[in-house]
A protein has these predicted regions:
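Intrinsically disordered, low-complexity regulatory segments
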Residues: 1-319
C-alpha cells in the first residue's frame, strides 16, 4: 500500500520523502487548503465560473466526494458495452440513448457526446458534465476509477479557479477508492460474502487462480486481470480500450482469468471511508463509533501501528 519515494518526487522542502513518511496528510492538507481558499474567494467575489447543470463550487466538490446514487445534472454513464442503436426524444425532456437496446436517460441540461452507431464500453461517459465516480469504479475497476476520479476532480477544481498538484489528488484518490465487496459464496482471507474489504490489503495476499492464463493483451479480450498491470487493478475486464492502452505501453503479457474474481469494486462516500477500515483504531476517525467498535470486537479486528494510516500511532501517543 506504500508509494515508492521516486514515484512521489521532490517534496516541498526540496528533497525526496523519507521511507516511512506519511504522504497522505500533507496531500489532503494541500487540497483542503486550496479548496478553502477558493471557496472564500468565491464567497467574496460573487461566485465561481464553471458548472454542471447549475452545480458548481463547493456543492460540486461535495457531490464528487459523497457520490450520491442519483443527483440532478450528473453526466450519463454507459451501463453496458455495445453500439448506440438509437437516440430518441424523451417525453419528459432530454433524450433516451439505447445501447444495444438498453435505455439510458440523458438530462436536457447535458449535451450528448455520442451518435447512433458509435461503440461504447460500460463505464464510458456519454454526455458532457460530471459523472458519478462510483459508476465508473463499478464498471471499470479500482485502478481506472482512481485515474478518472483524479481527472474529474482536477477538472472541477480548475473550472472553479482552484489549482493543486496532480500527485496530491492521486494520493487522495488512492485513499477514497479502495474498497471491494466480497461476492463469492465462500470465505476469502477471513472475509465473508457481502463484506466490504480494503482492496490494497486484499491485493497483497491475492494469488492468481489455478485456471488463470498468461496471454498477450490482444488475446485476452473480455477476460479479467489476475495481477495488476500499469494502473489497472485485479478484476479489471480487458476491453478494447484497455487492450489498446496496454499495447501503447508495450505490455507483452498479462495474467488473466475467464471469470471475474470473487469481489467487485465499490466506491463509498468519503464520510464513511474510515468507518469501513479493517483496522479498528482507524475506524475511530470515522462515524458511527459505537457500531464500528462492536463490529470490530465481533470480528476480532486488529490494528497495525506501522500501517498507512496515522490514526493508530496518534491514538497511542506516538505522534
Amino acid at each position: 500500500g506504500g508509494i515508492p519515494r521516486h514515484a512521489f518526487g521532490i517534496r516541498e522542502r526540496g528533497t525526496l520523502p523519507q521511507v516511512g513518511d506519511n504522504l497522505g496528510i500533507p496531500a489532503a492538507q494541500a487540497v483542503a487548503e486550496r479548496l478553502s481558499q477558493g471557496m472564500l474567494s468565491s464567497k467574496h467575489g460573487g461566485g465561481v465560473v464553471g458548472s454542471s447543470a447549475g452545480v458548481s463550487g463547493f456543492d460540486l466538490i461535495k457531490r464528487l466526494l459523497e457520490v450520491p446514487k442519483s443527483a440532478a445534472g450528473n453526466a450519463t454513464v454507459a451501463h453496458t458495452d455495445g453500439s448506440v442503436t438509437s437516440i430518441q426524444d424523451a417525453p419528459q425532456g432530454g433524450k433516451y440513448v439505447f445501447i444495444d437496446n438498453e435505455r439510458h436517460y440523458v438530462s436536457p441540461d447535458n449535451t450528448l457526446l455520442v451518435n447512433a452507431g458509435d461503440k461504447v464500453e460500460a463505464g464510458d461517459v456519454i454526455t458532457e458534465g460530471y459523472p458519478n465516480p462510483a459508476e465508473i469504479v463499478k464498471h471499470k475497476g479500482i485502478g481506472e476509477g482512481r485515474k478518472q476520479f483524479v481527472d474529474i476532480f482536477k477538472k472541477a477544481l480548475v473550472e472553479n479557479g482552484i489549482n493543486t498538484q496532480r500527485r496530491n489528488l492521486e494520493i487522495l484518490s488512492r485513499g477514497l477508492i479502495n474498497f471491494v465487496r466480497i461476492t463469492g459464496n465462500e470465505e476469502l482471507s477471513g472475509h465473508l460474502p457481502g463484506d466490504l474489504v480494503d482492496y490494497d490489503s486484499l491485493s497483497e495476499i491475492w494469488k492468481p487462480r489455478q485456471d488463470s492464463q498468461v496471454l498477450h493483451p490482444s488475446k485476452a479480450s473480455n477476460k479479467y486481470l489476475e495481477k495488476p498491470v500499469l494502473h489497472y487493478s485485479i478484476g479489471t475486464r480487458i476491453t478494447p480500450s484497455v487492450s489498446s492502452n496496454l499495447k501503447k505501453f508495450d505490455v507483452p503479457e498479462i495474467t488473466v482469468n475467464d471469470s471475474p474474481p470473487p469481489f467487485e469494486p465499490e466506491m463509498i462516500r468519503a464520510m464513511e471511508n474510515l468507518s469501513k477500515s479493517d483496522d479498528w483504531l482507524v475506524r475511530f476517525g470515522g462515524t458511527n463509533l459505537e457500531r464500528s467498535l462492536l463490529d470490530s470486537v465481533h470480528r476480532g479486528r486488529t490494528s497495525d501501528l506501522r500501517g498507512n494510516s496515522h490514526l493508530p500511532s496518534m491514538a497511542i501517543g506516538e505522534i
